[in-house]
């Protein structure tokens, strides 16, 4: 990427962050972002394509460290740790990411509402959580893909905001961990089907 393109990208992403922090997701237009970044609207469109593309790119940037950690051996999130531990560590990190970026999560959800299950960041998170659940319960008993959707649904911005309003990120972590444990323990417990 050329240096001016890199500079413009950074200016646009930082302007988006500032507008989200100051005004929330409802008041962010591409015109406002372009003006705040000091670039033309055409520059913004060429780089991101749409408001959805802009929020997808910003979330991907915010989640980049998490993406790297899940691939790094030796970290609590990385290969080599037991899948249950990796799942808990990943969910804890998502809780932290949600707390720091709640306005971005809300903006991203609204922008991607038509097709949120095809968003690149969501797809990476879903594939990772699905693989960890499947590794934790190789004997089956749990639809790992559906369970991953259920766990990731805990990071809906409105739900996360509501849960964190009384107990902060510690409550969100506890609730999400409890859900993950219940799903995994329930899958390990044989039961008769009706």
In which residue ranges do the predicted regions lie?
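Amphipathic C-terminal alpha-helical segment
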Residues: 97-100, 104, 131-135, 149-169, ...
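Short hydrophobic/aromatic patch on the recognition helix
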Residues: 38-48
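Short amphipathic alpha-helical elements of helix-turn-helix/winged-helix folds
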Residues: 15-19, 57, 69, 93, ...
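Basic, helix-initiating cap at the start of DNA-binding domains
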Residues: 1-23, 27-36, 53-56, 61, ...
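Amphipathic alpha-helical packing segments from all-alpha helical-bundle domains
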Residues: 67, 89, 96-100, 112-138, ...
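Amphipathic alpha-helical linker/stalk segments
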Residues: 60-89
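Short linear capping/connector segments at secondary-structure termini
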Residues: 71-73, 106-115
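Amphipathic alpha-helical interaction segments
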Residues: 11, 53, 85-89, 93, ...
């Amino acid at each position: 990427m050329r240096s001016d393109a890199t500079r413009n990208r950074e200016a646009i992403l930082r302007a988006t962050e500032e507008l989200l922090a100051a005004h929330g997701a409802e008041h962010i237009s591409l015109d406002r972002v372009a003006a705040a970044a000091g670039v033309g609207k055409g520059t913004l469109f060429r780089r991101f394509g749409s408001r959805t593309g802009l929020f997808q790119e910003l979330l991907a940037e915010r989640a980049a460290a998490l993406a790297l950690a899940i691939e790094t051996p030796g970290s609590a999130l990385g290969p080599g740790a037991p899948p249950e531990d990796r799942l808990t560590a990943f969910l804890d990190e998502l809780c932290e990411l949600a707390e720091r970026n709640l306005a971005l999560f809300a903006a991203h959800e609204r922008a991607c509402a038509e097709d949120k299950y095809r968003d690149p960041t969501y797809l990476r998170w879903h594939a990772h959580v699905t693989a960890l659940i499947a590794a934790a319960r190789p004997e089956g008993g749990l639809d790992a893909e559906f369970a991953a959707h259920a766990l990731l649904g805990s990071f809906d911005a409105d739900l996360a905001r509501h849960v964190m309003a009384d107990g902060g990120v510690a409550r969100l972590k506890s609730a999400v961990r409890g859900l993950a444990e219940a799903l995994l323990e329930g899958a390990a417990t044989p039961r008769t089907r009706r």
